[in-house]
Amino acid sequence: MHLLIVAAGSGSRMGADRNKLLLPLAGRPVLAWTIDAVMEADSITWVGIVGQPVDRAMIMELLAEAAKPVVWIEGGSTRQESVERGLQALPSVAQHVLIHDGARCLAEAALINRCAEAVVAGAAVIAATPVTDTIKRVDGQGIITGTPDRAELWAAQTPQGFAVEQLKQGHAEAQAKGWTVTDDASLYERLGWPVQVLEASPANIKVTTPFDLTVAEAVIALRAN
């Protein structure tokens, strides 16, 4: 299985002047924990890191002793563009691909393997967790306009897995139609293509804010004990 780590983010919501994936977490950069899980996943045989040129040297240091083939891919100005570039850089033999956010540093190898297995079996798939809070729709004036049925709501995570050629086709259509999507599952939705949900742990958070860093440190400490 081929896997792309999207690592082209910034640290703006962290209040940092550098990529949030290079901020320290339990004594190591955030991205190092993500890489560990990918390297531990038996299903993964090839890894592409999609990042910005300014971060390349530091990220490649983290990969100096990587146990699997890793390729550096220069990212774009948006996540969507970065994934497109990652897809173009895949080896010609790649039939399936997992897309994983570098900021989801608490993902475990078992989850990555489950996603890979589902994709090979023929499904487009995303890791997700059922929503436990009551969600409200709110208008531009801050007034509640509705309450979706919580039983139908899941919080999307990564990895997200797809057949390579179909995902490339989807991105080509999005580009032709001027669509902007925040993840690849949203692209499939717009095209009417089915995507299966695989239940993941609520611990598989995306580290975006200082509070997230605190939570991630606590989870890492708990796992160590």
From Swiss-Prot:
GO terms for molecular function: 2-C-methyl-D-erythritol 4-phosphate cytidylyltransferase activity. It catalyses: 2-C-methyl-D-erythritol 4-phosphate + CTP + H(+) = 4-CDP-2-C-methyl-D-erythritol + diphosphate. It is an enzyme of class 2 (transferase). Pathway: Isoprenoid biosynthesis; isopentenyl diphosphate biosynthesis via DXP pathway; isopentenyl diphosphate from 1-deoxy-D-xylulose 5-phosphate: step 2/6. Keywords: Isoprene biosynthesis, Nucleotidyltransferase, Transferase. SUPFAM superfamilies: Nucleotide-diphospho-sugar transferases (SSF53448). Its EC number is 2.7.7.60. NCBIfam families: ispD. This is 2-C-methyl-D-erythritol 4-phosphate cytidylyltransferase. It comes from Prochlorococcus marinus (strain MIT 9313). The gene is ispD.
